[in-house]
Amino acid sequence: MRQGVPTIINPYDLFALEEALQVRDRYGGEVTVLTMGPPMAEQALRKALTHGADRALLLTDRHFAGSDTLATSYALSQAVAKIGESYGAPDIVFTGKQTIDGDTAQVGPGIAKRLNLQQLTYVTKIVSIDPTSRELMVERHAESGTQMLKSTLPCLITVLEGVNAIRRGSLDDAFRAAGSTVLKWGAADAGIGELTKCGLRGSPTVVKRVFAPGPRAEKAMQMDINDKTLAEVAADTVTAIFARQPVLERKLTSHGNL
């Protein structure tokens, strides 16, 4: 149910927006913000304009209802391609690392795949961009540490949270946003010809219900570690675990792991 619920910009996308604005301020160009959603999503796009974006576009159509990440990435990729035809091909497509509702982190890479763009995920810093050679260097967060990656333009970058300080936007930006027209495209406007790839028809996954998990029936157990060595605490912990999971103890014992 969306009725009565205000729309917001996905928090991770705010960092992507700021990164795009910084690139524009340093190297020139324009920043176009794009989202897919119901008509009420216009207010979130207008908020992006107050931060300094040059253009806002809402992809909205009944054909998009019920889209999963596969259908969403298809529709957005077609819209990005159409934006390229109308306003010039983008050198960099920025997205947040993921959305706060689905948490899949699949849409950004999905767009890159469909548009045949180089993709740089979990980026923490854009080190440099060379407009002449059309190359850029970024820092990327990885489980093993930080990676330095070099890529060519055009590319798609998914941005991690906390990589920048999101600007408030000037008073002029606020007035401009209030008077700006948020472009609205339906499926036909975006050049989407294969409607079977959109919405529920184009979605292999279907959300049956969304719910908040209830509290666990099991209670946490507080252990007394006063005057005990680390070895004794470890032994007590293992004993407590095996008391609650005897099957685990039998399996470990039978395999000679204890």
Where are the regions that the model predicts?
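A glycine-rich helix N-cap at a beta->alpha junction
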Residues: 42-79
